[in-house]
């Protein structure tokens, strides 16, 4: 059988901006037979995420993520349906997910590398397992629980940067659900600001491309900032940190403004901002969700429950077709998405 796949065509360079042409689609032969322990799956949805930017470099700069190789199939979060199985615990028709799903229309995988998912947890919206009821949702929930130090009724103010993205849009809502009295989002368009306040329950939203961020922050956070969910780093974060209270907390989720630069992760703060951090005893610890695997299952159940109760609103931007993986990645890296950026490869969920 002939199937399509996407491979890494070229590297943008550590300081370059990724473009759709860094990826290319090609055809490849899929064997007709599968071995014991293997399954053949049809890909339904694929995820593009900011962390993937470092996988485009020859060296990712981390010990837990490997680089993609030139002319080799690219991989990431994916979900699909089993068409044929020789694995004892997986049967035809099961829905499965993996963090290392090849960007390919159909693929033969080791059944042990896959996790079965229950469509009822997402009311049939399978792509949500790649977003709010998946790794981005867990990153937001566990990050806030472990590093935010929020308790019900503690009257805290939380600021979220990259607030209309996959993690940010969920993090702000979770802030309220766990007890923050005020949640303020920072994003890059008027449309995103309106969405945050009218649909996702944010108390205020700041457009960093148009507004004076420092001024707007002072206005929308009169009691200062107690918790900062940082998705972007750079100048925006410097502005937020300078308005943070004593003994406040930064949740380091990502630094997308720094991903196209050859700097360590997390990037060091400027001397002036670092002085503020130390003086006010602000915690800024690297957070890696993969270190909290024991909290994944209860976390997914909690996120699913909030979603079903209507307390967690889920937003996603969907592009169709494997041939658009590169365009979807480029768009996500430049803020073209609202909520989770998803690529739909096949919508047919029956066999």
Curated annotation (Swiss-Prot):
Keywords: Cytoplasm, Lipid metabolism, NADP, Oxidoreductase. GO terms for molecular function: 15-oxoprostaglandin 13-oxidase [NAD(P)+] activity. The keyword Transmembrane does not apply. NADP(+) binds at residues 165-168, 192, 208, 231, 253-259, 287-289, 337. It is found in: Cytoplasm. GO terms for cellular component: cytoplasm. It catalyses: 13,14-dihydro-15-oxo-prostaglandin E2 + NAD(+) = 15-oxoprostaglandin E2 + NADH + H(+); 13,14-dihydro-15-oxo-prostaglandin E2 + NADP(+) = 15-oxoprostaglandin E2 + NADPH + H(+); 13,14-dihydro-15-oxo-PGF2alpha + NADP(+) = 15-oxoprostaglandin F2alpha + NADPH + H(+); 13,14-dihydro-15-oxo-prostaglandin E1 + NADP(+) = 15-oxoprostaglandin E1 + NADPH + H(+). Disulfide bonds: none annotated. It is an enzyme of class 1 (oxidoreductase). Its main location: cytoplasm. Pfam families: ADH_N_2, ADH_zinc_N. Coiled coil: none annotated. PANTHER family: PROSTAGLANDIN REDUCTASE, PROSTAGLANDIN REDUCTASE 2. Functions as 15-oxo-prostaglandin 13-reductase and acts on 15-keto-PGE1, 15-keto-PGE2, 15-keto-PGE1-alpha and 15-keto-PGE2-alpha with highest activity towards 15-keto-PGE2. Overexpression represses transcriptional activity of PPARG and inhibits adipocyte differentiation. This is Prostaglandin reductase 2. The lineage of its organism: Eukaryota, Metazoa, Chordata, Craniata, Vertebrata. The gene is PTGR2.
């Amino acid at each position: 059988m002939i199937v399509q796949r996407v491979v890494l065509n070229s590297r943008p360079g550590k300081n370059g901006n990724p473009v759709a042409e860094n990826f290319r689609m090609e055809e490849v032969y899929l064997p007709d037979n599968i071995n014991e322990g293997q399954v053949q799956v049809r890909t339904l949805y694929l995820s593009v995420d900011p962390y993937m930017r470092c996988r485009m470099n020859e060296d990712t700069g981390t010990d837990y993520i490997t680089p993609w190789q030139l002319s080799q199939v690219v991989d990431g979060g994916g979900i699909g349906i089993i068409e044929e199985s020789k694995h004892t615990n997986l049967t035809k028709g099961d829905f499965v997910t993996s963090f290392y799903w090849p960007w390919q229309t159909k693929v033969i995988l080791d059944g042990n590398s896959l996790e079965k998912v229950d469509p009822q947890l997402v009311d049939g919206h399978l792509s949500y397992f790649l977003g709010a009821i998946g790794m981005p949702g867990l990153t937001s929930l566990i990050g806030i629980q472990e590093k935010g130090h929020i308790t019900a009724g503690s009257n805290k103010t939380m600021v979220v940067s990259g607030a209309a993205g996959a993690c940010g849009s969920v993090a702000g809502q979770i802030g309220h659900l766990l007890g923050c009295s005020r949640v303020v989002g920072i994003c890059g368009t008027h449309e995103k600001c309106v969405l945050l306040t009218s649909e996702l329950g944010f108390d205020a939203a700041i457009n960093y491309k148009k507004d004076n961020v420092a001024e707007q922050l002072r206005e929308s956070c009169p009691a200062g900032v107690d918790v900062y969910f940082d998705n972007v780093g750079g100048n925006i974060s410097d502005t937020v940190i300078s308005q943070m209270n004593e003994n406040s907390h930064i949740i380091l989720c990502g630094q997308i403004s720094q991903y196209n630069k050859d700097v360590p992760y997390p990037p060091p703060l400027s001397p002036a901002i670092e002085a503020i951090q130390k003086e006010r005893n602000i915690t800024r610890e690297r957070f890696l969700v993969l270190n909290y695997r024991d909290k994944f299952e209860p976390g997914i159940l909690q996120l699913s429950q909030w979603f079903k109760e209507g307390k967690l609103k889920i937003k996603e931007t969907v592009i169709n077709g494997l041939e658009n993986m590169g365009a979807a990645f480029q768009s996500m890296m430049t803020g073209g998405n609202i909520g989770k950026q998803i690529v739909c490869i096949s919508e047919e969920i029956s066999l």
